[in-house]
Amino acid sequence: MLENFSVHQIISKIKDREIKIAEVINFYLDRIKKFNPKLNAIISHIDETKITEEAKLKDENFNSDNDKDDIYGLPIAVKELFDIKNEVTCYGYKELLKNIPKQNSLLVDNYKKNAILIGKTNLSEFAVGCHTTNRVYGATSNVYDHSKSAGGSSGGAAAAVAANLIPFADGTDMMGSCRNPAAFANIYGLRPTPGAIAEDRFEIKNLKDFPLISTTGCFARTPNDMEFLFNYIKGRNVKDKLSFDLKDINNKKLSDLKIGWCIDLNEQYKYEDGIIDLCENILKKLQSNNLNIEDLKTEINSEELWYSWIILRAKFLYENFLLYNLKNLNELPSQAYWEYEKGKSIKTKDVLKAIEIRNKYMDKIQNLFKHYDFLALPSAQLFPFEKNLNNPEFINDNKIDTYHRYMEVYTLSSLLGLPTISIPVGFNNKGLPMGMQIIANVKEDNKVINFANSYEEIFNFSKFKPKLMQ
């Protein structure tokens, strides 16, 4: 019965006492038992007895006080890198299997007030790269083809949501880690403005102006479902001095909106055949719904973006790796080792130059948003690739020069801190899904979600469910 219900419908039925929280939890636990062995999306499980006892207790509390938060009693599985007290957090890396946190992450503390934690979702090793595989938990399968990648680094979360193992999920996004797996799963994935969701943060030493380049994000099958999670976890928290509250934004009619279609950023980005066609087919249909679409030619130089981005990313990751006190760096996966070595070589002057380039493009992007409500780019440069690959090496016949060049399409939003949602755009002739990034100005997170809601009303991509999960 619950299989075809939206999050809104489930919440309404719980509040009206038409269904019990325990029934909802049992529904999702049954689906996890049935489908998760094929997917490997949820990789760490809270004891089922504890979960069912908590569900019963929440039902009892609801009966005595029904003024509860919307996500009260709903199941959630956090990305493996978030700490749950007394549960392993290892980032998919064997050396850290004995890392047992003594306290919860801010996000987990927030969940525990209302939701029911059922486990953790899989990730790329150290959350580096757009392919969810690691040497502790293995690879997560794509919900539309189990031989393909689920994307990453939050691929476990996206696969779990797409398979309806959980109603929605968090992820993190530095370089596409919510947008990429959402595109690979035919769902919606949000990279908010960094700071919109409070986090446990560390500061880069001696670099107070170092920008926020990573953020917690969200996944859901529909934007409306996503709003319930995002509205709960967003907002200022006194424990995170960089967090802030978002302002509400009035909805605009589609006919009043204008999108700048960046395509390949002045022929600078490479895409697997078929990706541009899917995006442009959707854009034509949006035009027929009176949305204004313009092909965009800009002064943005992708190589400058790339230079700035890989400096800031590698420096951030290098400083992060130092926190783990790893004994054998040669055991790092190749992608993480690349970042460690790159970060180790970066000087303060390199970072300052990268920040200078970033600031230059912040000014340019503000000028663009005077003319456009949104910018648009494909959500990936490749369709879901073989799961047994360590890393893609080609885009069509073009050799990739670093492990992450196939992720370059994410750098515009990531470098400039722009809220971005990946929306589904359809499937190729092999039945593999793809998405498109809708990018708004800083702190206009609600604007991209509002647009995505209108978009889903037109196209109803959530009706396409993976046959392998039925």
Stretch-by-stretch model annotation:
Residues 71-94, 253-262, 311-366, 378, ...:
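Short helix-loop capping/hinge segments that flank enzyme active sites or metal/cofactor-binding pockets
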Residues 21-26, 56-59, 102, 271-297, ...:
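Acyltransferase
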Residues 17, 73, 166-167, 346-470:
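Glycine-rich, small-residue loops and helix-cap segments
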